[in-house]
């Protein structure tokens, strides 16, 4: 399948993911392209990732992972990062999560909303986890909720009906792609900013973020003519 170029007819984007590091496995390369082009991108994290490091208690891991996420965002030109403080590892799909995300959509007023893979499986067939699935499905619904003045009245301000695109990265079957070759070093820097988390994984594959990201970006680029390195998205017109 040949991937299509990611649409460029938008000015403001909101990235909504479950955990610190979720966007950095490739998606942040696209963010670097967008901020270099002068687009406004902000991040919303549903949790602080406090349950993500087995050797560090949540009370310590939360602030540590928040700091790493802010550094990862700075590497790709993003200054505005918010956290909702839903509990890591047990994120529940439901009205509270939809309300919280819809409120930020109304306040930030994005035309593009980006989230992570919320399908049941990752590319290659590995099972996804509940936090990712619940967050992505809540993001999908919150894009609609934000535009309905009778849903969550008063949350976040006036209704916002101009979300034009929802995009998910890390998906099994992408439809669109962004050429990240010119900003690949910034994509690597954003993933490398999660030093404590990557070290705790104890995974030789993740010991070298550049090699890991390059292999995935080369695979996507095989479906995206003209690019040597690319990140894929499934695009859902709203």
Where are the predicted features?
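Active-site rim/loop-helix segments in enzyme catalytic domains that contact anionic ligands
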Residues: 1-111
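Metal-dependent de-N-acetylase/amidase catalytic core
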Residues: 1-14, 94-238
């Amino acid at each position: 399948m040949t991937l299509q170029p990611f649409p460029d007819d938008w000015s403001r984007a909101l990235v909504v993911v479950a955990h610190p590091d979720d966007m950095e496995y490739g998606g942040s390369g696209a963010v670097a392209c967008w901020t270099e082009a002068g687009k406004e991108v902000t991040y919303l994290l549903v949790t602080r990732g406090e349950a993500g490091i087995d050797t560090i208690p949540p009370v310590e891991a939360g602030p540590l992972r928040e700091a790493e996420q802010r550094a990862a965002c700075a590497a790709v030109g993003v200054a505005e990062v918010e956290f909702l403080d839903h509990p890591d590892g047990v994120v529940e799909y439901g009205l509270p999560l939809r309300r919280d995300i819809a409120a930020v959509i109304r306040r930030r007023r994005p035309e593009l909303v980006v989230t992570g893979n919320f399908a049941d499986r990752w590319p290659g067939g590995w099972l996804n986890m509940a936090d990712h699935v619940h967050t992505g499905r809540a993001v999908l619904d919150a894009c609609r909720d934000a535009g309905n003045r009778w849903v969550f009245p008063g949350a976040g301000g006036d209704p916002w009906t101009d979300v034009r695109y929802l995009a998910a990265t890390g998906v099994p079957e992408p439809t669109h792609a962004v050429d990240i070759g010119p900003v690949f070093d910034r994509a690597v820097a954003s993933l490398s900013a999660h030093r404590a988390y990557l070290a705790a994984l104890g995974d030789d594959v993740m010991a070298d973020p550049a090699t890991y990201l390059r292999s995935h970006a080369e695979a996507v680029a095989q479906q995206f003519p003209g690019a040597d390195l690319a990140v894929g998205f499934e695009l859902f017109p709203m």
